[in-house]
């Protein structure tokens, strides 16, 4: 950043993602972007659900050919969300449906049992092509039964903590440079 003569001109778009967008937050961020010199059409805001959408649709189509699930960990708490597509509409309407949330036991064996049960209840008998696990609180060491349940039916399972930031980058790229998702419309809250 220090060696760039005109930082604002060299950035094609600035994307900010946050768990939830509120009107005061949006107004404050827009003012901050304006103060930094960014025109309104190059400063973007989205919540984590929209970042999940962009991250998912920028993957190979086989990753999202069926349902896509998301488990969000926050220490002992875990919540579930699902990417839903109405493939019969044009453009294809895509949204995120929030599911249940639960608190997991702190002891490893019981934690695995709790999460495995939550996975079964959340996924029900639907067909998923992929599942994402994000946040702090998931560890492969305790999740023996859970991982086996998640990986059933040839589901692809991914875990890490960069899904929302990568989704924000893909969204900025889509809005400023590419138009890969022309046939899709994100429908948020």
What are these regions (language model features)?
Residues 62-79, 84-86, 135-138, 185-189:
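A short acidic Gly-Thr/Ser loop motif
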Residues 162-167:
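Repeat-based blade/solenoid architectures
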Residues 14-25, 121-148, 156, 160:
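Glycine-rich phosphate-binding loops at beta-strand->alpha-helix junctions
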Residues 24-31, 55-57, 78-83, 139-146:
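A short acidic (Asp/Glu
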Residues 1-5, 52-59, 110-127, 171:
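Phosphate/ATP-binding catalytic cores across multiple sugar-kinase/actin-like superfamilies
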Residues 170-189:
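Acidic, glycine/GT-rich loop-and beta-edge segments that sit at the periphery of enzyme/chaperone cores
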Residues 82-113:
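Short glycine-rich, Thr/Ser-proximal phosphate-binding strand/loop in the N-terminal lobe
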Residues 1-68, 89, 99, 152-153:
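Nucleotide/phosphate-binding catalytic cleft detector across ATP-hydrolyzing
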């Amino acid at each position: 950043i220090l060696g760039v003569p005109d930082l604002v001109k060299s950035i094609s778009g600035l994307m900010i993602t946050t768990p939830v967008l509120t009107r005061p937050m949006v107004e404050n961020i827009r003012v901050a972007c304006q103060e930094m010199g960014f025109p309104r059409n190059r400063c973007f805001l989205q919540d984590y659900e929209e970042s999940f959408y962009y991250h998912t649709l920028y993957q190979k189509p086989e990753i999202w050919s069926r349902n896509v699930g998301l488990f969000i960990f926050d220490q002992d708490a875990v919540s579930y969300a699902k990417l839903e597509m109405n493939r019969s509409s044009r453009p294809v309407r895509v949204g995120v449906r929030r599911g249940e949330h639960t608190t997991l036991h702190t002891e490893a064996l019981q934690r695995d049992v709790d999460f495995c049960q939550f996975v079964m209840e959340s996924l029900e008998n639907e067909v998923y092509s992929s599942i994402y696990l994000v946040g702090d609180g998931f560890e492969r060491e305790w999740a023996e039964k859970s991982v086996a349940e998640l990986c059933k039916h040839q589901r692809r399972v991914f875990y890490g903590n960069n899904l929302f930031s990568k989704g924000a980058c893909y969204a900025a790229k889509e809005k400023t440079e590419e138009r890969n998702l022309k046939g899709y419309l994100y429908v948020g809250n």
